[in-house]
Amino acid sequence: MGEHIYKGRKLELLIPASSLEVLKIAVIYGADAVYIGGEAFGLRAKAKNFTLEEMKEGIEFAHAHDCKVYVTANILAHNYDLDGARQYFKELKQIGPDALIISDPGMFTIAKEELPDIDIHISTQANNTNYMTYQFWWKQGAKRVVSARELSLNEIKQIREHIPDEMEIETFMHGAMCISYSGRCLLSSFMAGRDANRGACTHPCRWKYSIVEESRPGEYMPVYENERGTYIFLSLIHI
């Protein structure tokens, strides 16, 4: 795979890893970095996730292969989360991840206090849709901001032009297509009683849907999707 350089900095291929086995596979096959979640404070409650011992082993393995490891702590925290988060960050300090991925300002504040020497990346969960937001997080001490999935390539280019060269932009290339906005999805809570903002998303954005017209109960009109958009009645109506 050829290298792509921006102002002397190579673009980074970042891969999610749901287990120690997946982490090692991603590293062996050439990932520049992987991101992982612990048993709390991340948004992948259904994944196996990592114990602290597994994190330590994974970080040591990755570093031995010149690969970075980022740890997610990107829940939208409630009051009862904060003391546990502080203790968790103290434990993470002992195993040395390369960065934390955070969305909540309260969690950000605790992380800066407990891990002042570790980079912080601002999660897509924080709704990062404009260059002023990026500038704000840079002033707070964030190293990288993850673009909202709603952004076009042109919008990302405009952001790049308005932020310091040293600041990093991360962009998703595939995966869930969150709405309302970029991760702060209410569909899972509404439809399945499982809160996406607490790591229990059922991914209703990936389900297949039909439309029912009010006066025709029981008559289901399928919804189609292709690279050009989403359709009902195929060529008749474009959503």
Model-predicted segments: where are they?
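N-terminal active-site wall of soluble small-molecule enzyme domains
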Residues: 4, 67-136
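N-terminal basic/disordered segments at the start of proteins
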Residues: 6-33
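Hydrophobic faces of well-ordered beta-strands that scaffold small-molecule active sites
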Residues: 13-16, 34-36, 69-73, 100-102, ...
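Conserved, mostly hydrophobic/aromatic
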Residues: 26, 104, 137, 171
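Glycine-rich, proline-tolerant flexible connector loops at the mouths of alpha/beta enzymes
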Residues: 35-54, 73-81
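Active-site-adjacent beta->alpha loops and helix N-cap segments on the catalytic face
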Residues: 46-56, 103-115, 150-164
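Flexible C-terminal active-site loop/helix
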Residues: 145-151, 162-235
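Conserved small/polar residues in nucleotide/adenosyl-binding loops
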Residues: 237-239
